A protein has these predicted regions:
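Short, ordered loop/turn segments at secondary-structure junctions
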Residues: 51-53, 80-86, 119-120, 144-147, ...
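N-terminal phosphate-binding or glycine-rich loops at protein starts, especially the Walker A/P-loop
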Residues: 40-89
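Short glycine-rich or small-residue beta-strand-to-loop segments that form or flank ligand, phosphate
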Residues: 45-55, 113-116, 137-143, 169
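Glycine-rich oxoanion-binding loops at beta->alpha junctions
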Residues: 2-39, 86-139, 174, 183-196
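Short, acidic/small-residue loops that bind anionic groups at enzyme active sites
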Residues: 155-184, 188-193
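Solvent-exposed alpha-helices and their adjacent loops that cap or buttress functional pockets
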Residues: 37-42, 47, 71-73, 105-109, ...
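Short Gly/Thr/Asp-enriched flexible loops that form oxyanion-binding sites at enzyme active sites
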Residues: 61-65, 146-165
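Glycine-rich, mobile lid/loop segments that gate access to catalytic sites or pores
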Residues: 131-147, 155-156, 166, 174
Length: 197
């Protein structure tokens, strides 16, 4: 069911507040396979971008994402956006790379991100223009709080234009400072190394 949600805060007090005010509680769409999917896999084109600072596990996430898209959903057109959101801005001239299961098979052995990364705000309209030019149906944004704010801005521009592009955020930060999350990948490793020092 698409209307199943997981509540972020489940306390009697918060439930009472939501009922009294009529507010919609903070929640997540329930993860897992659905009865039907919006995009037809054979025609779907996906892009993956990594932004912000590097942290342990980035290449593992890229690899797992590509493998799931290919082997579970049968999606074979997957692009890697180079150097963060800069890769969606034409003036930087960062070429996209084709991501395949064989290409990402051993990237977990390397640190950082094979896609490169960058920091800083980019022009949202230009980024969405690039997604349209590339015929992207789904954009996965891997990053911290700034990246996720950027992903939300991209989503709002897509919504404004009434485009059929999905945007998904994959939280990553060694700071563990993303709302509604107990732990993000990268934090555990950073904490354990800092603890050893």
């Amino acid at each position: 069911k698409y209307d199943e949600r997981i509540l972020h805060e489940v306390t009697l007090e918060s439930i009472k507040d939501y009922r009294e005010t009529g507010a919609i509680p903070a929640s997540f769409e329930k993860a897992g396979p659905k009865e039907s999917i919006f995009f037809e896999p054979a025609k779907t084109k996906v892009a993956i971008v990594t932004c912000g600072g590097i942290c342990p596990g980035l290449n593992n996430v890229i690899r797992a994402l590509v493998n799931q898209l290919v082997y579970r959903y049968g999606i074979t057109r997957i692009l890697g956006i180079r150097y963060g959101y800069e890769g969606l801005i034409p003036k930087y001239n960062h070429p996209v790379i084709e991501l395949t299961a064989p290409m990402v098979s051993d990237i977990y052995q390397s640190g950082g991100t094979i896609l490169g990364t960058s920091r800083g705000n980019q022009d949202v309209e230009q980024m969405v223009n690039t997604l349209e030019i590339l015929n992207i149906n789904v954009l996965f944004c891997i990053g911290g709080d700034g990246t996720l704010r950027g992903a939300h801005a991209i989503y709002k521009e897509i919504e404004k234009r009434k485009l059929r592009i999905a945007v998904a955020g994959i939280p990553k930060t060694i700071d563990n400072d993303i709302d509604l999350m107990q732990k993000s990948f990268g934090f555990e490793t950073a904490f354990s190394i800092a603890n050893d020092i």
